[in-house]
């Protein structure tokens, strides 16, 4: 292997691959579910045209990559999938903590998310429900650090008011949510931030703190940087209905974890899968593509499908240079700087939920599991990693005890997606002015195709968007290689 490295915030891309301490820093009692079972050693018989090593190379082993590889494999193309990490899943990550299956990344699915739901039906995968109904206790933490306990009914009534006011024109702006720029109004609103609209809504202190918390989570950033149309589009994808939308976002997870669906898709694909293989360069040559890995291996293919997160493009050399539109996206990046945290406390707190306003760290807190014997496992989503060191157990304990005084923290498990050099950010989120330029991000460039949740038309912040983009890439491969 070469000694060349590329760095992000002090982390070596090469050292990250072999360092579980970096991948799961700050984790107590964590055991990653074996993703290697999806690795294929054989490929469906095919005749590689043009003297290339493969018909198709897919870069990235998340849901977009697994979907694209499956589509290409089933079309008879000899397909190789390269994943930089030592695991599959991309920005999903099934693991275990305190005896429970957990998800560090994308998790929730729903029948209103058509692409991922169809895949679950295809492979016979059911759902498990999170305990987010019939809540026992709800809290809000304001930006000044004060905490207010509110009845679940009052809490729910106020977030509904705030959210419906925020998205009041979603039907008008996105009558066809899977065609994002169908209306001129969508393009016009792309000049506005979520904060611009929140300021006009006349919300109460509670409602403003609730919607700030929620929108900071979607952004993985402060709401002044978060483009308004992206939120309206997601709401439209959920049927322009608050109850339906909330059900898509917080209720159902894939039985057996996200890795179960990844494994099923890749097993079906017949693709060859290699992990711990970062790609450093992609060059279009002689009617095909030459891919260079970080140990200087050269792999050739008729087509390459890039499914890695947008924020990592800057670590890959493209020849010829990518279009100006893509270069602008690469320079801007996508917003989200979020992290995921699980906390095991000794006390049985029951079914709890809490928001914390955007300047506070623990923006979304909910019960993952609870019992008198177990205590409580809290699932916590952090909008901006800079608000807390998720690997500092003392800091985490202090914040949890502000919300739930007197609890004893038994363990924590964390994943900082921005510190992961193969993500450099969390879930997809568009800044002001980005959604209207989505076509630039989606467009194929010669023999290089682009997928990933950021490039999807519909549920861009969800697993469904990644699957959608992988299906599109599969169609585009067929058009190029037919």
From Swiss-Prot:
GO cellular component: periplasmic space
Residues of the signal peptide: 1-38
Pfam annotation, one family: Amino_oxidase
Regulation (activators, inhibitors): The catalytic rate is not significantly affected by pH.
Binding residues for FAD: 64, 83-85, 91, 108, 279, 453, 462-463
Cofactor(s) listed in the protein's UniProt record: FAD
Protein's name according to its UniProt entry: Nicotine dehydrogenase
Organism, scientific name: Pseudomonas putida (strain DSM 28022 / S16)
GN (gene name): nicA2
